[in-house]
Amino acid sequence: MVVETDKKELICSFCSKKQHEVKKLIAGPAVFICDECIDLCTDIMKEESKVALKQITSSIPTPQKICGILNDYVVGQDQAKKILAVAVYNHYKRLEYVQSGNNDVELNKSNILLIGPTGSGKTLLAQTLAKILDVPFTMADATSLTEAGYVGEDVENILLRLLIAAEFNIAKAQKGIIYIDEVDKIARKSENPSITRDVSGEGVQQALLKIMEGTVASVPPQGGRKHPQQDFVQLDTSNILFICGGAFMGIDSIITSRTNHSSIGFAANVNIDKEKNNSEILKSLEIEDLTKFGLIPEFIGRLPIVTTLDELDNEALITILTKPKNAIVKQYQKQFELDDAELVIDDSALEAIAEKALAKKTGARGLRSILEHLLLDSMYKVAELKKQRVIITQEVVNGLVEPIMTSLISTKSNKKQPIIEDIPA
């Protein structure tokens, strides 16, 4: 039996134009699309990208305003804030320039490297910048990344997180910010190139090069490793701002060794930087120090803006506890307030908390865990008792006595007492 088939002329599934009416007809699974519809889709996507960029660039604050907003959340680090504010402002102005079609001068992208001790505010600076600019933001830990083909996380998964942050709006994601933390942990194991594979060090640096410089990356929308059968989202990284951060423990010795090397005589090397702290030493940082530390020259070249952050002292930690809009003490006070209770932390207690964080060398990052440990029992009790005032003193912080709890109902006026005592300027 012969089955007769109608040989119908192929048509575009979108505009219904016949094959002979268009230049090209591309076949997909049970559908066809013509070159004209492809051009139209491309134009729509370009227009969406322009709109997304216009929304960002039209609301970019000036460097001084960016710095002012950073001051509300980040304590100290004035030079780093100034450098970041100018860098971010110039980055998004560059996008506006590129989108305008001007090509008389080519403006290159300037990614940023932040170097500073643990808890000095690197991550907070990057997060706050993204909040100020209202752009998609994601963070990645460099230690979890490995070179493609090895156990670990591919660098494309960082781009997937940015897409998720942008709710899969590709145009928006392409103008976002990616913060890669602990980038010092992917330094190669020795200064000289190794014949063995360094998949979590130099291999990761090599993998990051392309996306940091600018490429159209194939991102698996479901995450995980790539395989030929899966679909990919194409993401252009040319306009994504990369901020890398790390503590770079030991780089101060490299800098000191270099600066002392030029001195003459045996006595010259005897701790001429003895009185300098790490922050002062880091200000003498040069590219060769980063290379000696283990970053490859090509990777350093993708991070033209390098800024160092100061180690936080006792005074700065007390300010972090009490002054910013998101101050940790203010957060705990609000938590107590939700249970009809008050939290009072006196000056001596604040001093003791700061000293504990300094002793642990955790910087601002350790303040929350210290307070959480101090207030755990009090938070456990006030939820039941209600109307309680909890007082934290130096003795409480040092573990000599329990937090002092008094009833708010016993006071006649029942007025709230000052929650933080004035801290001397």
Swiss-Prot record:
ATP binds at P117, T118, G119, S120, G121, K122, T123, L124. One of its GO terms (molecular function) is ATP hydrolysis activity. The keyword ATP-binding applies. Gene3D superfamilies: 1.10.8.60, ClpX chaperone, C4-type zinc finger domain, P-loop containing nucleotide triphosphate hydrolases. Residues 1-53 form the ClpX-type ZB domain. GO terms for biological process: cell division; proteolysis involved in protein catabolic process. Coiled coil: none annotated. This is ATP-dependent Clp protease ATP-binding subunit ClpX. It comes from Rickettsia massiliae (strain Mtu5).
